[in-house]
Design a protein with these regions (language model features):
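Membrane-embedded beta-barrel scaffold of Gram-negative outer-membrane proteins
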Residues: 330-334, 340-346, 351-356, 542, ...
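Solvent-exposed loop segments that connect transmembrane elements
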Residues: 220-228, 265-313, 357-368, 408-465, ...
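Outer-membrane beta-barrel domain signature, strongest for Gram-negative TonB-dependent receptors
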Residues: 226, 232-393, 399-404, 599-601
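Structural signature of Gram-negative outer-membrane beta-barrels, strongest in the C-terminal barrel
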Residues: 242-246, 383-384, 395-399, 466-608, ...
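Outer-membrane beta-barrel translocator/receptor signature
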Residues: 118-119, 131, 140-143, 149, ...
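C-terminal beta-signal and adjacent terminal beta-strands/loops
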Residues: 416, 655, 720-728, 749-801
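Acidic, small-polar-rich N-terminal luminal/periplasmic segments of exported/outer-membrane proteins
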Residues: 39-175, 587
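Gram-negative outer-membrane beta-barrel transporters
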Residues: 391-393, 485-489, 606-608, 631-730, ...
Length: 801
């Protein structure tokens, strides 16, 4: 169903009010004096196709956010919810600054491991952020954010099958000036953001320094640790230099550092119910949460109510640290009056640590601890030419990245499962003899550096390790030609070659003292190489200077790779996957109506995925048992419709509406639908609903300003909504998410060079939780369970700038 009937009346009524009110206002204006000042919607210039052009002239589904960055309650990228249809930008709370991105139902299968590439690119000043850690950028000194929906493979390359979030910061102005923003709020929120511009050599060199510091005491009481969580401690500082030695050359160099010592933002509630608290499932595919988890039974760390908790109880604090050093260069050289060379390059070096209490209970049951090092380098060289009736962009792109990850699972979990092996010398020696590669102990290996097993008080840990290098290069071309003043043709193509070299250690059991020794009994050493072509063609018809229709066909691909979240060599070798491909047909209508007071954009799309990468259940051909596999498992069709409307109702009032409808369906998908029946039957599962594809998104709100004294009062309010979503691959009841709502608002007073703003977030104080069940079956309780603490409660703050 492309259009959600539940919201049809609301949307139709809203648009009718927009247009009807517009006609009334236009009629009233005609009766005013001829010299009355006109008003309307400001034009926004974007670089969605690598060249500067009006957003309304771009035959791409794009939302450009500019003024809202300064006047609305956008603290960071996660607050863009509701500003663009079919777009969800959330926090992935198990990584520092981690992003959970979803555009038109396209989202990463998982974001916790650097071996997985995301299908949506986050760019900052032309640099692709290659890991999800640190992608939730803080909002200050941002010139604009462009959200491009649909495959953008021709100009932006690999891993853009869902779209692109393009963030552009301001350049040094070359004049003395400063902006300062200080914020205080609930739960000890303290923020300080500053940017200072200054000339160095007049007309030749300009500079800018910037800094952001954020602290927060946390909002969720932890009754086990006796404090609030998660605490936030974030810093970003750096400088930019703008070189303009002559009229032809320009270069901006930015050097910066991020230091995020915050707790992991995605806190969990315990979902370890005691016997009989939850209702027994009727679906035989569902884990029986009415039976107590092992964490509850063995340690008494039980949850005794179905009500969403108002506290956390994990016994290990979710400590984290992310340090990032980055260098970005943007340079251009004017060749002729209408052509130039452009270079964009940069490096990013990330060091990441995190530990989280995986069972989310007061029991010392299981923790996961990870150390990551990640480096990336990219270079892009473009030739751009714009004439009266054509635009040409051609270029070369190079990418290299490398990561290393150590991770350890600890707590009492492995002692519960393999304590007899760890503490019995004969069994420990036998386990060392098989090295986890075959025999009765496979896939478990035991540390060859420890003789006689572990002591009774030792914590049994499992050690894992992986490292990967990725390198790709691409050549691309995009050309647009105006046949006449009505019709334009667009065609583009990109050729990409990429290889990945992956090494992972055979997991083994050891103790805490030796958890970083890397004493692996064996390694998986894997290599893959691909080359792909990503084309795009389109036609644009200009009805008049304010209205256009376009139709386009574009393709993109998401890189193949290796499933890094495995424990043994055999599974690493099995879980290699090829690229997935998107083929998107899009029809759009863009318009400025009512004398430039109503901007109305409509889009319909049909995005077909082939070889979609997915984790599914299949029969192992060797052991004849069922197990989870990661591979190119499905073909999926995403269809939808989008409305974007911005209406200047009066000189002082603007209304906006953003609605996206999505219908996702499998065209082909095979898996074991009932993993607990013991049959291991892999069958057609195309009747299931693809996960993480919300039925709709909605954002509606207003901005009102009025002159008061020597200044101006401005009120901004936004309501956003996300529809029903399946978070479970098998559409289990436990994974059915009913959707979420959010209301935020702010009121500010602006005068000359200062302002004060009062803001509120989650004003309806909505709460929800989404459970994750580990282990168990229809006839047995889980090993342990947790649920994501969905939203921070209602909060207020005040900002001075």
């Amino acid at each position: 169903m492309i259009f959600n009937s539940k919201h049809f009346t609301v949307i139709l009524l809203s648009l009718s009010i927009f247009i009807f009110n517009g006609f009334l206002t236009v009629s009233a204006q005609e009766n005013q004096a001829n010299n009355s000042e006109s008003f309307g919607i400001e034009e926004i210039i974007v670089t969605a196709r690598k060249v500067e052009e009006s957003a309304q002239d771009v035959p791409v589904a794009i939302t450009a956010i500019t003024e809202q960055l300064r006047k609305s309650n956008i603290r960071n990228l996660s607050d863009l919810q509701g500003f663009a249809p079919n777009v969800i930008i959330g926090n992935y709370g198990e990584r520092s600054g981690g992003a959970n991105l979803n555009i038109r139902g396209i989202s990463p299968p998982r974001s916790d491991d650097n071996s997985f590439d995301a299908p949506i690119a986050v760019m900052i000043d032309g640099i692709h952020l290659g890991t999800s850690a640190g992608q939730i950028l803080e909002n200050f000194d941002l010139e604009r954010v462009e959200v491009l929906r649909g495959p953008q493979g021709t100009l932006f390359g690999k891993n853009t099958v869902g779209g692109v979030i393009n963030v552009i910061r301001s350049k040094p102005t070359g004049e003395f000036g400063a902006r300062l923003k200080a914020t205080i709020g609930d739960d000890g929120q303290q923020e300080l953001r500053a940017v200072v511009n200054f000339p160095i050599s007049e007309g030749k060199v300009a500079g800018k320094v910037f800094a952001t510091m954020i602290e927060d005491d946390g909002w969720l009481p932890n009754i086990t640790l006796g404090k609030k969580v998660p605490e936030k401690d974030y810093q970003n500082f750096g400088f930019s230099l703008l070189f303009t030695p002559n009229e032809k050359f320009e270069a901006t160099v930015t050097i910066e550092q991020f230091d995020d010592q915050s707790d992991l933002a995605g806190y969990h509630y315990s979902y370890n119910f005691a016997n009989g608290v939850a209702t027994p499932p009727t679906d035989p595919r569902q884990v029986n949460t009415a039976l107590a988890t092992t964490a509850c039974t063995n340690y008494g760390a039980c949850r005794n109510s179905l009500d969403i908790p108002s506290y956390a109880e994990n016994d290990t604090n979710n400590d984290a640290a992310l340090e990032t050093d980055a260098i970005t260069i943007n340079a251009s050289y004017q060749l002729t009056e209408n052509s130039q060379l452009v270079y964009v390059g940069g490096t990013r070096d990330l060091t990441e640590y995190r530990i989280y209490d995986f069972d989310a209970s007061a029991a010392p049951f299981i923790t996961i601890e990870r150390w990551n090092d990640y480096e990336q380098t990219s270079h892009e060289l473009r030739y751009e030419r714009q004439t009266e009736n054509s635009t040409l962009v051609a270029g070369y792109y190079f990418w290299n990245s490398e990561f290393t990850q150590d991770w350890v699972t600890g707590g009492e979990f492995w002692k519960t499962l393999f304590g007899a092996v760890a503490q019995t010398p004969a069994l420990w020696a036998a386990c060392q003899g098989t090295n986890g590669l075959d025999g009765a102990f496979a896939p478990i290996a035991c540390d060859l550096g420890i003789q006689g097993g572990l002591g009774p008080n030792d914590i049994v840990t499992q050690i894992l390790y992986e490292t990967q290098e990725t390198e790709s290069e691409a050549f691309f071309l995009n050309y647009e030609y105006d046949i006449n003043d009505k019709i334009s043709l667009n065609a583009g193509i990109r050729w990409t070659e990429e290889w990945k070299a992956f090494i992972a250690g055979q997991a083994y059991l050891s103790n805490v003292e030796r958890q970083r020794e890397r004493n692996f009994p064996g390694y998986a050493d894997l290599y893959q190489k691909w080359d792909e072509v990503s084309p795009r063609v389109g036609v644009t018809y200009r009805i008049d200077e304010d209205k256009m229709i376009y139709i386009s066909y574009s393709e993109g691909f998401k890189s193949g790779g290796f499933f890094g979240v495995n424990q043994n060599i055999r599974d690493f070798e099995r879980d290699q996957y090829d690229p997935e491909f998107a083929s998107n047909v899009e029809v759009g209508f863009k318009s400025l109506l009512l004398e430039n007071r109503l901007r109305l954009n409509l889009t319909a799309f049909r995005n077909e995925f082939e070889d979609k990468q997915e984790s599914f259940v299949a029969l192992d051909p060797d052991t004849k048992t069922v197990q989870s596999v990661f591979n190119n498992a499905a073909e999926v069709l995403y269809e939808g419709f989008e409305i974007e409307a911005l209406f200047a109702a009066t000189r002082n009032l603007q209304l906006f509406l953003n609605y996206g409808s999505l219908d996702a369906s499998y065209e082909e998908f095979f898996t074991d639908i009932n993993q607990f029946d013991g049959l291991g039957t892999v069958e057609d599962a195309s009747f299931l609903e693809p996960r993480n594809a919300p039925e709709h998104t909605l954002g509606v709100g207003f901005q009102y300003n009025a002159q008061v004294g020597n200044g101006e009062i401005e009120i901004y309010a936004k309501y956003s909504e996300t529809g029903k979503t399946q978070t479970s691959l098998l559409n289990l009841t436990s994974g059915a998410f009913d959707g979420s709502e959010d209301v935020s608002a702010n009121i500010g007073y602006y005068q000359d060079n200062w302002n004060v703003v009062l803001f509120g977030r989650n004003l309806t104080d909505e709460q929800y939780e989404v459970p994750t069940l580990l282990g168990g079956s229809f006839t047995s309780g889980p090993l342990f369970s947790m649920s994501n603490a969905g939203k921070r409660p209602r909060a207020f703050g005040i900002e001075f700038g």
